[in-house]
């Protein structure tokens, strides 16, 4: 009598239909054949249990996932699995992940498992809104048509009082920074309450906009429980802000989907910080790729998301970051494009290479590379803007520095250093 049925989920001659969701996995079997391991993934992520059953509903039979591709790759294998849409609730990222990234990661029959990519058909994708603004919308409300947007986190990222933070914000915005940004763990504290900060910072922003005749914005961190985030978003909108920042991984997908609806009602763009992503994206053999995370975030509707730099201090090589950025900026049915954010170890000397690698549709966030300028944050901001202008004009930084003392001092300090 047949007991296990994992191979029933493997059909390498199967051709997926246009209305099926395709998922690509890397896996390493543990004590079972590659075919059985792949079948176990397909079974557990669709309708399966470990054994044959007394009765099988007709709908369940039609909902069986199918492994249709299996090839050796390094120490493991690449499998492609087709999932009928009957397995998925419309418009629910959390239900999708409970299937394709759920129990399968705990199976003993696998040494390693990594979700590489997924391809939703339009019939599934149409239930997601994507970004409210996207690249085009953000460029319009910021009034920046061609160059990369600039952003800075006041460093150190903790410890500022509201008044101190406001003073730094004034200097940074006045020096040419477009977007002031809170860091991932900077929310609300006895020494710097969110409610006080939001009011003070937007007053400063209005002053700088009048003085510089440039649009300025504040990526204020509203991360918290859902009820707290909603209240904070309302405060931002009431003060005339047009952005909020959310730590999307620690906040969770369900909360992010809810806040996408809230921010649309309030007219707010979402800046997505990816803190904690490396817990499951960094190991090349196990977890979920940052590419897949970026795709999920775009479906839900963030307007910009951190992707890496390839030249800074954070993990992520050029090919990985380039692939993510290219996807975020590509046409994808009705889903708007998303601004990639380069951050982590950036300074003026790296601008020509960064822009050469990734182009001008980019948010360039430099924290220490602005705040660490010998003459202070305003000079650091101007040095960054001058370096970006030089890169776009095709002018060598050393040549540009002859007319920019701020850039010269930045180059004297950091040169073209790539932080480790």
From Swiss-Prot:
Q: How is the cofactor bound?
A: Binds 1 Mg(2+) ion per subunit.
Q: Which residues bind Mg(2+)?
A: 181, 183-184
Q: What is its EC number?
A: 4.1.1.39
> What catalytic reaction does the record list?
2 (2R)-3-phosphoglycerate + 2 H(+) = D-ribulose 1,5-bisphosphate + CO2 + H2O; D-ribulose 1,5-bisphosphate + O2 = 2-phosphoglycolate + (2R)-3-phosphoglycerate + 2 H(+)
Q: Its GO biological process terms?
A: AMP catabolic process; carbon fixation
Per the UniProt entry, the signal peptide is none
| Pfam families per the UniProt record, alphabetical | RuBisCO_large, RuBisCO_large_N
Q: How does it assemble?
A: Homodimer or homodecamer. In contrast to form I RuBisCO, the form III RuBisCO is composed solely of large subunits.
Protein name as it appears in the record: Ribulose bisphosphate carboxylase
Q: What is the lineage of its organism?
A: Archaea, Methanobacteriati, Methanobacteriota, Thermococci, Thermococcales
């Amino acid at each position: 009598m047949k007991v296990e049925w994992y191979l029933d989920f493997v059909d390498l001659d199967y051709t997926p239909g246009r209305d099926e969701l395709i998922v690509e996995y890397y896996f390493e079997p543990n004590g079972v054949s590659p075919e059985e391991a792949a079948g176990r993934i397909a079974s557990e992520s669709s309708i399966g249990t470990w054994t044959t059953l007394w009765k099988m509903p007709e709908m369940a039979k039609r909902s069986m996932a199918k492994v249709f591709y299996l090839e050796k790759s390094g120490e493991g294998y690449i499998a492609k699995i087709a999932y009928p849409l009957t397995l998925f609730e419309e418009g629910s990222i959390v239900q999708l992940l409970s299937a394709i990234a759920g129990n399968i990661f705990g199976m003993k029959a696998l040494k390693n498992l990594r979700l590489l990519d997924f391809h939703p058909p339009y019939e599934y994708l149409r239930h997601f809104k994507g970004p409210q603004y996207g690249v085009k919308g953000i460029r319009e409300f910021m009034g920046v048509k061609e160059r990369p947007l600039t952003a800075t986190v006041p460093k150190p990222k903790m410890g500022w009082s509201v008044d101190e933070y406001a003073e730094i914000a004034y200097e940074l915005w006045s020096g040419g920074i477009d977007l002031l940004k809170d860091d991932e763990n900077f929310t609300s504290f006895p020494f710097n309450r969110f409610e006080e900060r939001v009011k003070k910072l937007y007053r400063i922003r209005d002053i700088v906009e009048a003085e510089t005749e440039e649009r300025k914005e504040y990526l204020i961190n509203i991360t918290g429980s859902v009820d707290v985030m909603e209240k904070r978003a309302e405060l931002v909108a009431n003060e005339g802000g047009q952005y909020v920042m959310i730590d999307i991984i620690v906040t969770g997908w369900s909360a992010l989907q809810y806040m996408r609806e809230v921010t649309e009602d309030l007219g707010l763009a979402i800046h997505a910080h990816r803190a904690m992503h490396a817990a499951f994206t960094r190991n090349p053999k196990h977890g979920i790729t940052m590419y897949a995370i970026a795709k999920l975030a775009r479906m839900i509707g963030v307007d910009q998301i951190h992707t890496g730099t390839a030249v800074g201090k954070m993990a992520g090589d050029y090919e990985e970051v380039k692939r993510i950025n290219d996807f975020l900026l590509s046409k994808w049915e009705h889903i708007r494009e998303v601004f990639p954010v380069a951050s982590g170890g950036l300074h003026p000397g790296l601008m020509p290479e960064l822009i050469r690698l990734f182009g001008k549709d980019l948010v360039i966030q430099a924290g220490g590379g602005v705040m660490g300028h010998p003459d202070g944050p305003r000079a650091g901001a101007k040095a960054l803007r001058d370096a970006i202008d030089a890169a776009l004009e095709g002018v060598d930084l050393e040549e540009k520095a002859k007319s920019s003392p701020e850039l010269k001092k930045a180059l004297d300090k950091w040169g073209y250093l790539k932080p480790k």
